[in-house]
Amino acid sequence: MRIGILTYHTPCNFGANLQAYASYKYFTSQGIDTWIINYSLLSDKSYDIVAEAQKEAHWNFSQQTLRVTRVVNNDSLLDLVREMNFDAIGVGADAVWNKRVVDDLRVFFCDWLFKSDLKDKVKVFALSPAFMGQTYSDLPLDVKNDFKSALEQFTYLDARDQWTAHVVNKEIAGYELIKNINPDPVFLLDKFVDVEWKHPNSILSKKYYLISLPKNYTKSLGFLKRIWVKRLTSLLHRRGYQLVEIPIPDGASGIDSDYVVPYPIDPLQWYLWIKNAKGYIGVRFHAIVSSLSAGTPFLSLDTYGKVDSKIHKIFSYLGFHKNDHFINKSSKIRNLIDGSGLEDCRINGTFVFMVSPRKIIEKLENIDLSTISKFRSENVRIFKSNMAEMIKRIKGI
């Protein structure tokens, strides 16, 4: 069986690269002839904002580490599918149903395929796609109807989280079309990493805490943030640990740490920095999934989702971050860890410098590693079970 995976694999984003890698590795391990469809994303502006030294690392990974087809765009997708003679196309993972550009959305809902002569020859399945937004209500009715018709022709349907399923079911389908929730493939990543960790001799495994903050984090309220980092670093030093910053692709945060991982950072090396850390403190969804895959304690500085409540914002500013857990239903971090026993490993990231560094360290030190292990194992089990069912449907068994 030959499949093509249609996903976000080229952006300057570690998570986007690694979810494609994990999917590719998993299906290949099942004896499936697997390709990443080298689709050029119309809405991808990441190369315009990422640090120059980092761009090549993402592009090389997407084109050399992954098994990719020739580069295609909206006009050449059908020709590629014919040329490759795919039995099926997988859509996802990642936020491929984000409505940044309608033409990209059409690609990832696959209505272009179902409107072609290949609709009865090539099957389509969902592979943990996500929305990562608030609403589809502003999409034209004819576009919604096209997407509904396309989804109803998928051989297998799932979504990465409950929020995606909820919004698609309510605003696109009009009924409970998506019923399965399928974990992110990065849960499986650890078993597929076959490279050695590259690091200076001064940095030892499990003797540092890793932090990742937004670019130019200290530009606003810098005095308070620098004091917070200084206190955090001092407390870690007393415990015999270093503070290492791994910058996001856009650029470093501007904080003072013991070491900053230099660009260019290969996505697999990025994962290994998380795996070898004593704990991870930081932003980004796939950094948290990678922590779970690696068994690394984490504190998510959650900036996802949207909450309009002024009272909520005041509570967050005052340090009452648990309020966010009950209100911010669209946060993909909340959707990820709800029901895991790790809900306290997430706080509103906007005002993290208002949280005591001592409390953060104690929270990380007190995380039960067996809880992480059980949660990871359960997600891996669900992923494999869902994909086994998908393969049966594709094969018509």
Give, region by region, the residue ranges found by the protein language model.
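Active-site anion-handling motifs in enzyme catalytic cores
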Residues: 1-397
